[in-house]
Amino acid sequence: MRILLALTWLAWLGACTSIEQPRPDFADDDLPPIATAPAAGRSGGVFNAVTAWSLASDGRAYRPGDTLTVTLEETTQASKRADTKFGKNGDMAVKPGVLFGSTVPFDSSFGAKRNFDGGGSSSQQNTLRGEITVIVNQVLAGGLLQVKGEKVLSLNQGEEVMRLSGYVRQADIDTNNRVSSRRIANARIKYVGKGALSDSNSAGWLTRFFNSPWMPF
């Protein structure tokens, strides 16, 4: 009996503990590293094609290695609702009959009624605001910029990690060298937390078991 109570107590404590959840990895998202081939030029000349800036340019990113500031303006909202109702009623009555010339005092009635009323709703809303500076990784043949960047904030009780990658049109970059995240094609934005604060918001293993699809109740 004592062993059973001890096991029950340990299981109850395990449901309250915070076990580290699997975190998404921060791989390079299949983006190759920046590789800029040096332009051929004369040695000792005043003009260098690699580091030269045009007098008519406005400082916007346009070549591998340039930085670009992305303004995060992500808002998603989804909702779903379903209502189902149906019913069925049935009645049957048996009146007195005649058997062998005599009236049988048999009178009865039956009735059945079934109703179903079910409904469900689901909603989700996410908002992400902020800024992150990325680096131009590659310039495609059509002038599309392939960018990627990472920002890590180390706090006293954890760590916040943000990563962004995608493709940017040069025409969408403003004169301040900024672009909205809504204008990034194939955008992959990751924002996760690590540490004590993130672990405190995670359910224990026993709680996750009771909330899993394996529970028949």
Swiss-Prot record:
Keywords: Bacterial flagellum, Cell outer membrane, Lipoprotein, Membrane, Palmitate, Signal. GO terms for molecular function: cytoskeletal motor activity. GO terms for cellular component: bacterial-type flagellum basal body, distal rod, L ring; cell outer membrane. Its main location: membrane. It is found in: Cell outer membrane; Bacterial flagellum basal body. A lipid is attached at C16 (N-palmitoyl cysteine). Residues 1-15 form the signal peptide. It is a lipid-anchor. A lipid is attached at C16 (S-diacylglycerol cysteine). InterPro entries: Flag_Lring. One of its GO terms (biological process) is bacterial-type flagellum-dependent cell motility. Assembles around the rod to form the L-ring and probably protects the motor/basal body from shearing forces during rotation. Belongs to the FlgH family. NCBIfam families: PRK00249.1-4. HAMAP family: FlgH. The basal body constitutes a major portion of the flagellar organelle and consists of four rings (L,P,S, and M) mounted on a central rod. This is Flagellar L-ring protein 2. It comes from Burkholderia thailandensis (strain ATCC 700388 / DSM 13276 / CCUG 48851 / CIP 106301 / E264).
